[in-house]
Amino acid sequence: MLISNEWLKEYVTIDDSVSDLAERITRTGIEVDDLIDYTKDIKNLVVGFVKSKEKHPDADKLNVCQVDIGEDEPVQIVCGAPNVDAGQYVIVAKVGGRLPGGIKIKRAKLRGERSEGMICSLQEIGISSNYIPKSFESGIYVFSESQVPGTDALQALYLDDQVMEFDLTPNRADALSMIGTAYEVAALYNTKMTKPETTSNELELSANDELTVTIENEDKVPYYSARVVHDVTIEPSPIWMQARLIKAGIRPINNVVDISNYVLLEYGQPLHMFDQDAIGSQQIVVRQANEGEKMTTLDDTERELLTSDIVITNGQTPIALAGVMGGDFSEVKEQTSNIVIEGAIFDPVSIRHTSRRLNLRSESSSRFEKGIATEFVDEAVDRACYLLQTYANGKVLKDRVSSGELGAFITPIDITADKINRTIGFDLSQNDIVTIFNQLGFDTEINDDVITVLVPSRRKDITIKEDLIEEVARIYGYDDIPSTLPVFDKVTSGQLTDRQYKTRMVKEVLEGAGLDQAITYSLVSKEDATAFSMQQRQTIDLLMPMSEAHASLRQSLLPHLIEAASYNVARKNKDVKLFEIGNVFFANGEGELPDQVEYLSGILTGDYVVNQWQGKKETVDFYLAKGVVDRVSEKLNLEFSYRRADIDGLHPGRTAEILLENKVVGFIGELHPTLAADNDLKRTYVFELNFDALMAVSVGYINYQPIPRFPGMSRDIALEVDQNIPAADLLSTIHAHGGNILKDTLVFDVYQGEHLEKGKKSIAIRLNYLDTEETLTDERVSKVQAEIEAALIEQGAVIR
């Protein structure tokens, strides 16, 4: 948003320089990205009056002009502009003057004729061609009103000004208008803001006699109003208005269109002006477009509409694409006499979808997308009527034709001085706090210690108590908040917390296992929001997402990790091993904050060990991924168990839940072949753990045991079992019959194929025995081994 200092002074008076004002605004939360000085690099630029023009004797395209620049005698200037003529007031750069780009004006001879100065175009004094009126695109600028020769040309053009460029965050849509900015500045300087004139001299003829308004869907169009102005004269707008539009980055067109744009910038309320006689009926019907319906917009482009688009119609034919662009046949032309002014509130989501789909971004659509201040809708239309009466000789009909409800102008929020003081860390009196709210233009009501703040609709960023607290701190001045030393119950300076220490240990374990840490977006598409979720709970969706791919808060880290793996594989990095520790989000009831839970997730695909001279490659499989998870459990001194599970998105026969103290804390498995193929991945294994749950159980140390004094003993066993029997069931049986000498087990081979019956698999398991009190004997181990084998046979296994 470009804010002209000259224009701003119309609403609020301050003594600070523009640079000081810009610094103060930046310190309170709105970043001033640039300060544009239209007088920079310009010297000796005055108004001139062309007294005579004669053809150059030796050049067909040059003219010799005698120009009055307020001195004793006219000066002779040779000019090649096609539109120069006697009787014009023009911009003259005097000898010794300077123009943007380092151009210095000197006396010269052009084809033998003396030239003492330069008659300038707007481009030559630094105005972008994008914003120059079309009538002056290819020639010098000619003043439409009489001027005094010799006066400062920049003053005459209303360009002796400095303009602040705001870099606004989406929540501060109120600063997308001059009045919204004036409220902000008035609050910063504790001064009054003067609003512009909106009252017109109205005819006795009522607009209700000439027009009706109907809204078919008030969910999409809560309010629509129109006023009528007759007998307007289409001509250039005043110089001061053109200058303000140019400084705001808008090209002047004519007085009627310029007034529409001027009020848009002034109030932040988009308006649209129709040629009343071209509408084709006395009714305006606001509805959603019919599927396949077409209309031609002001840019002479035929648009095919969808049912999600909102259109303004004459009862049958669309005459405007609501909130985005008008239609061609109802636009204001030079012959236009009667005007219908539209002021409305449209659904922000619908406007955003339409403008994005059609690639029609405009000053109007950008404001509708962020939400309109209901308090300004009718006032902005009245302001346009006043300006049309003043600068287009219009006759304003009385009454407003409207449909729907404007909605609330204010939002009441209760707060106390104690709440504010506890949050900002120092004491302000209730009176000081109320004064700050009044500076912002917020009315207040006081009931004992409760302050009810009536927040106007223009401040859509203020919805809760904490927003009010921020406003108090901003306007009081962050720089003026007294410095205090923090008070800690327990000082941990230079020391990791227990949580930080454990998290660092886990990261080191995973990095040691060959995984790289990833950090991905918390926002996912609505389709991915519940993918792999361990809790069946409602998602948290954004009201106005920047894109469909980032519309909801995630309930799992895996969707983006899968996307990251696919991205790497597509770029020839086929061996991908990633992990992430991040937050997932689950909605609670209305008005309640969501739950934020920290998860640990990982993804592995390709080769775990690349084929090198040291040894053969090792491809990622289920047991390798499980080994990574087991390393985490060992480091945190936890004992995981595994249970077969069916989880959407994972292979039905290679998936397990991870249990801790008989509670599910995660899962591990192979990505479903279909999902893997959709992402151009080969066999891929993933795991996800509720990291908060692990941290709640984990102790901050590892229980160490002395190195055994007696040797252990290992036995291998090969089992042929039904392919649907999980290895975890077999291991559970083994440990149940292993007594106190079976210390651990390891699945080291799984085979299916030749030499085995269909539907069977072979599993090889290593059993490690140890007695810490005495040396094991073969007889003792064989006895336990026999009991284990008997139990396995009873379970249906065949000992190979």
From Swiss-Prot:
Its EC number is 6.1.1.20. It catalyses: tRNA(Phe) + L-phenylalanine + ATP = L-phenylalanyl-tRNA(Phe) + AMP + diphosphate + H(+). InterPro entries: aa-tRNA-synth_II/BPL/LPL (IPR045864), B3/B4_tRNA-bd (IPR005146), DNA-bd_dom_put_sf (IPR009061), Fdx_antiC-bd (IPR005121), Fdx_antiC-bd_sf (IPR036690), NA-bd_OB-fold (IPR012340), Phe-tRNA-ligase_IIc_bsu (IPR045060), Phe-tRNA-ligase_IIc_bsu_bact (IPR004532). Mg(2+) binds at D461, D467, E470, E471. One of its GO terms (cellular component) is phenylalanine-tRNA ligase complex. GO terms for molecular function: ATP binding; catalytic activity, acting on a protein; magnesium ion binding; phenylalanine-tRNA ligase activity; transferase activity; tRNA binding. It is found in: Cytoplasm. Residues 708-800 form the FDX-ACB domain. Residues 408-483 form the B5 domain. One of its GO terms (biological process) is phenylalanyl-tRNA aminoacylation. Its cofactor is Mg(2+). NCBIfam families: pheT_bact (TIGR00472), YtpR (NF045760). This is Phenylalanine--tRNA ligase beta subunit.
